[in-house]
Every structure is written in structure tokens, then in C-alpha cells.
């Protein structure tokens, strides 16, 4: 895409000569560069403008499905007018984005204080429509089930197994499809040059600011379409075992019952991911579609956060407070599991090790040391470790970042009460 300054505005054209391609981007080193006058503008000024007056949008190119390849087209004035002329729906998510969490703070920083602001008007029209249709689909599924003679029964949330629960299940799966659709239909989506397709929001485990974003067509056959998301959900259902009944219980891990169970856990990685704040991106849409079907599960306006076992400095009064909260909670979880542990069955713990988690002098990070220390103090013995290459090296998360490189499976068994103690010097001997 080649920008050209024309009078007081900038026009964009599709170039085919690599020699004429722009040599660099316009945002780097905390500054933005004006294409017209080459002036540098501080990021803090751009953010002030974004929060006070908002950022504009301009359609600069259209990607079409061609004969076994992508076609890149310059938008007409009519097409550009359609984009800016769409009216934003009234009933959109208005829940606030946490402004102090670095995983999501780019949104309010650039004039998007609510979760609904992360989407264009056209995307909001599509998502609210799909979301509302979930309820209509449930009513149709209920009528169809009742017409076959199936008993009405209890709701799905009450462990029902009749027509009502069936309709609730259909609606739940459809809502999960809509939830997946948001990942490919927001103003945070970017363009993958290598695959020539839209890149989803969570290609990284954080929400960045995207200056040149993509709007995918939910009715197309390309990446990000709605039926593709439904297919992912259906494949997951097909892959689930139907030989045994599964039971899921959501509870605080520090007080959960670990009796007659085998524990295998993938715990939070200290401060690496702000799970609950990031989950709000999907939760606001799931709640819109399913709060009448799962009222207890979706009773809160946003994802509950206070008990989340993550070392979050802004939620626990700084780094020291976050470390103490995580260390204390982690130790209580493992002590609770140790209380009724069966020595015949080991506990397995997955830990994703960062590429730069070990420094040049061999010291490990706070997260790794905290987790190991909590396990040992809780009465466990680490009897084996198995490395697993669980992350794809070329994925977006790993390119130029301190990404999670591999997983280590720790095998734990209860340490006998009369186990002897040895110091480091004795161990080295």
C-alpha cells in the first residue's frame, strides 16, 4: 500500500513494484511520524488526542477472494462512504476496560474506554445481530425437540436432560461460536503478510494497539467467517468422549476438595498473563447471549478478579504485595492437595518456561523460584521432570519477544513426614 500526499489529505494506492514500497512504518520509538510533513509527534500527544477527540478511521484497501489467490483493490468513494456511514448500535457492551492492567491498557490509552469501543460500527452491527439470534435459535431448537415428544425437563444449569436442556446446550454452543467470532472481528485484528489473511486479536496474550487493522467478512469463506467458528466448536464436541460422563465444578482452588482424585494442573505463571482482565473481552459477549441460560455462572457484570491467583501488582499494592499474594495462595493450593493425596498416584504440574527466565549467571526468575518453593514447603517431593516442546517457535507470540519456549512437566509425590533433611553442601557431595 503506497501513501501519497494530495493537498491536505493522503490517498492510498495498491503498488506492485517493491522498489516503490514504503521503507518504514510511521510509529516507532514512542513517536509517530506525519506522512505529509515528516514531523515527529510524541505518543503522549497522540494519546491525548485519542482520549479527548477520538481517532478516525480510513479504508485504505480491500482484499478480495480471487482465482486461487488474493486480489488487492483500491476502495471506491462509495465503499469508503459506506464504512463511515454505518450507525453504531445502541445496545453494545459498555463495561469499562481496566486502565491499570498492562495487558489491556492500550484500549483506554487510545480512546477506547469500554469493551464495545474495541469494535467498529459495522462489526458491532454484525456481532449484536449474531448474539441476539442465539436466543431465537434456542426457541426454535426447543420447539423442534418438544415436537419429537421429548419431555420438557429442567434447564441445563440445573443438570436437566430434556428438551429445555437440549435447547440451552444448542444456544451455548452457538454463543461460543459468536465469542470466537469476536477474536477475528475487532479493530485490534491485524494482517498476516505471510498467510495473506486476518490475524486474530489474541495472537499475543495481550491486547495491543493496532494502527492498520483488518475487518474480516463474517459471511465469506475466508479466515474469520462465522461458519468457520461454528465448525471449530462442532469439531471440539465431536472430539469429546461420550463413553463416560464428565462433571465440572468451578471453585476456589485453595479450598477445593482433593479427595479420591488424581491432580494434573496447569497453574498460572506468576505475572505472565492477566487471565481475568483479558477474559472480559469474550465475557461481555457471552453474557449478552447466555445470561438467561446460565444465570449463576454469568451473574457478575465482568469476570470475577479478586481471588484470581496471579501476581498482579496493580491489584495487590505493588510488586511485593503481588508476590506475597501469589506465594501464599499457591502454597495453600498445594498444601490443600497434599492433605488427602494418595501416595500411589503422582501429581503432575505443567509449567511453561520462558526463553529468558534464566539469567546469564544462572539465576532463575521470581515466578519459577516461587512455584518450586511453594511445592516443597507444602510437603511435596519433586520426583521427575519431563521437558515438552509445547509452543510453536514461529507463532506471533514468539517473534521478537520473551515468549514461553517450552513446558516442563513436574511429577510430585507426597513427602513422608519423617523424610530426612539435607543441605546444599551435603547434596553436592
Regions found by a protein language model. Give the residues of each.
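Nucleic-acid endo/exonuclease domains
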Residues: 320-328
Amino acid at each position: 500500500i503506497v501513501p501519497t500526499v494530495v493537498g491536505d489529505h493522503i490517498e492510498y494506492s495498491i503498488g506492485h513494484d517493491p522498489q516503490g514500497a514504503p521503507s518504514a512504518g510511521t510509529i516507532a520509538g514512542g513517536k509517530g511520524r506525519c506522512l505529509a510533513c515528516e514531523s515527529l509527534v510524541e505518543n503522549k500527544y497522540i494519546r491525548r488526542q485519542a482520549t479527548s477527540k477520538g481517532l478516525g478511521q480510513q479504508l485504505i484497501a480491500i482484499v478480495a477472494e480471487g482465482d486461487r489467490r488474493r486480489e488487492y483493490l483500491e476502495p471506491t468513494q462509495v465503499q469508503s462512504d459506506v464504512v463511515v456511514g454505518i450507525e453504531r448500535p445502541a445496545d453494545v457492551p459498555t463495561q469499562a476496560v481496566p486502565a491499570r492492567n498492562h495487558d489491556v491498557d492500550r484500549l483506554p490509552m487510545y480512546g477506547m474506554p469500554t469493551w464495545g469501543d474495541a469494535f467498529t460500527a459495522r462489526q458491532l452491527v454484525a456481532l449484536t445481530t449474531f448474539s441476539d439470534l442465539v436466543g431465537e435459535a434456542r426457541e426454535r431448537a426447543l420447539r423442534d425437540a418438544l415436537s419429537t415428544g421429548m419431555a420438557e425437563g429442567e434447564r441445563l444449569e440445573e443438570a436437566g436432560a430434556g428438551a429445555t436442556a437440549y435447547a440451552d446446550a444448542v444456544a451455548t454452543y452457538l454463543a461460543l461460536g459468536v465469542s470466537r467470532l469476536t477474536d477475528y472481528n475487532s479493530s485490534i485484528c491485524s494482517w498476516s503478510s505471510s498467510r495473506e489473511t486476518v490475524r486474530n486479536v489474541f495472537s499475543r496474550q495481550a491486547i495491543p494497539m493496532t494502527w492498520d487493522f483488518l475487518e474480516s467478512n463474517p459471511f465469506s469463506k475466508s479466515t474469520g467467517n462465522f461458519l468457520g467458528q461454528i465448525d471449530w466448536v462442532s469439531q471440539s464436541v465431536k472430539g469429546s468422549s461420550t463413553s463416560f460422563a464428565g462433571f465440572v465444578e468451578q471453585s476456589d482452588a485453595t479450598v477445593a476438595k482433593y479427595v479420591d482424585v488424581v491432580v494434573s494442573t496447569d497453574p498460572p505463571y506468576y505475572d505472565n498473563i492477566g487471565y481475568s482482565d483479558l477474559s472480559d473481552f469474550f465475557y461481555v459477549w457471552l453474557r449478552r447471549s447466555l445470561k438467561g441460560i446460565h444465570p449463576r455462572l454469568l451473574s457478575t457484570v465482568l469476570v470475577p478478579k479478586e481471588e484470581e491467583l496471579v501476581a498482579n501488582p496493580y491489584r495487590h499494592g505493588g510488586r511485593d504485595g503481588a508476590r506475597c499474594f501469589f506465594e501464599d495462595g499457591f502454597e495453600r493450593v498445594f498444601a490443600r492437595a497434599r492433605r488427602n493425596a494418595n501416595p500411589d498416584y503422582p501429581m503432575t504440574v505443567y509449567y511453561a518456561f520462558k526463553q529468558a527466565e534464566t539469567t546469564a549467571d544462572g539465576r532463575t526468575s521470581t515466578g519459577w523460584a516461587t512455584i518450586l518453593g511453594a511445592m516443597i514447603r507444602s510437603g511435596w517431593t519433586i520426583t521427575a521432570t519431563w521437558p515438552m516442546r509445547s509452543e510453536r517457535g514461529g507463532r506471533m507470540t514468539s517473534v521478537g519477544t520473551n515468549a514461553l519456549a517450552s513446558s516442563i512437566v513436574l511429577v510430585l509425590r507426597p513427602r513422608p513426614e519423617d523424610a530426612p533433611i539435607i543441605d546444599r553442601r551435603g547434596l553436592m557431595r
